[in-house]
Amino acid sequence: MNSQGVPEPSADLLSLATAVRRAAVVLGQSSNQQRQQALMAMAASLEAHADRIVAANAEDLAQASADGLAPALVARLKLDAGKLAGAIDGVRQLSSLQDPLGARQLHRELADGLVLERVTVPLGVLGVIFEARPDAVIQIAALAIRSGNGAILKGGSEAKCTNQAVMQSLKEGLAGTSVSVDALDLLTTRAESLALLRLDGLVDLIIPRGSNELVRFIQDNTRIPVLGHADGVCHLYVDQEVDCTQALRIAIDSKTQYPAACNAIETLLVHEKIAPIFLKEAVPAFQEAGVCLRGDEASRDLGVEQVATSDDWSQEYLDLVLAVRVVKDFDEALEHIRMYGSRHTEAIATVNHDTAERFLRAVDSAGVYHNCSTRFADGFRYGFGAEVGISTQTLPPRGPVGLEGLVTYRYRLRGEGHVAADFSEGREQFSHRDLPTGTE
């Protein structure tokens, strides 16, 4: 084990990862139809074994209750029949989306008979580490197969029974298709998940989904590229020129529709000129919705009961708790977001078009919204079918990452005996003529 506590991979883990890698190489060369059929078979198998999966989840929930698991984690852990049915529908919808592979992004004649193209291809093998949410196994497995990638998944121990039941069903579905069952696998121990971080050369991308601590640890302890976000500290700024009724609906939805989500707001910023009017309606509305408000001095003077400390501004509650601050103007709101935001999703409520456009240009987050809930920051709601996670990094992919974020590209050059010397010595000339991209 190295100084940071990450062990060397065992022989069994190396064997598993090698098998996934080999299956991924074949999968990456499969046809769109083969991958679509694989997804439909996975969905059918999940449906056939729904009772087994829900029963396994009940075991996990009972153990979570006995262990005193935090309410936010319990909410993510639950996979009842309705939630499972929704996840299965998502797999089927994903199969109908446009094939992300083989898309020709560039088609160029470099010289007579020498043609270059840039075509989308799979990344290879995804290593996905997540906490609680067992439906993530379904989403990630489906996205991986659809995009031609293998996947090694490791869920939290709190969802062990559910994850195993789901993976068993997925593999049983793949067994009747041309896609190898080895393209997907599940790790079950903490030692394996740590050693996964050492599999550079076998794993091409690590995707962590979970707490700030989990993501930070992974980023600090692997040479494999990491896609993800460490925090979801999202804001709603209520401008001085605003439809208060509309803004309140947006605020309530952004906080309460699913408070355990990373795209729920954690801080409400209100312009001082509208604060007396807006908070008069907002405070009782939030209280009725069961939200605990913590505010600065100005907001407490307007009805917010609890005191917000400096720690609250950077806190991802994942619960029915909301920090409230009254700001003197637009610029102070921007400065607060720059200082405390996590570059996930920020929103403004305003009827002033110029103010909205300035906000949309100035805020450097993966998602920046005008007059709508932050809860729309989601791959399914964006029409991606599903997502492997949300990335807050500046380099792409950014925001909800669906199929397009799980592919890279390859340059292919076809010639007729061309050599570079002919061009450098003047016997041949480059034409650099763009051709229609069309299909591969």
UniProtKB/Swiss-Prot annotation:
InterPro entries named in the record: Ald_DH/histidinol_DH (IPR016161), Ald_DH_C (IPR016163), Ald_DH_N (IPR016162), Aldehyde_DH_dom (IPR015590), G-glutamylP_reductase_CS (IPR020593), Glu-5-SA_DH (IPR012134), GPR_dom (IPR000965)
Compartments reported by the entry: Cytoplasm
UniProt keyword annotation of Oxidoreductase present: yes
Any single biological process term in GO: L-proline biosynthetic process
Keyword Cytoplasm: yes
Gene Ontology molecular function, alphabetical: glutamate-5-semialdehyde dehydrogenase activity; NADP binding
Superkingdom classification of source: Bacteria
Catalysed transformations (reactions): L-glutamate 5-semialdehyde + phosphate + NADP(+) = L-glutamyl 5-phosphate + NADPH + H(+)
Keywords: Amino-acid biosynthesis, Cytoplasm, NADP, Oxidoreductase, Proline biosynthesis
Xref: Gene3D superfamilies: Aldehyde Dehydrogenase, Chain A, domain 1, Aldehyde Dehydrogenase, Chain A, domain 2
One Gene Ontology CC term in the entry: cytoplasm
Pathway: Amino-acid biosynthesis; L-proline biosynthesis; L-glutamate 5-semialdehyde from L-glutamate: step 2/2
EC number: 1.2.1.41
Function: Catalyzes the NADPH-dependent reduction of L-glutamate 5-phosphate into L-glutamate 5-semialdehyde and phosphate. The product spontaneously undergoes cyclization to form 1-pyrroline-5-carboxylate.
HAMAP family in the record: ProA
Family, similarity comment: Belongs to the gamma-glutamyl phosphate reductase family.
Name of the protein this chain belongs to: Gamma-glutamyl phosphate reductase
The species this protein was found in: Synechococcus sp. (strain CC9311)
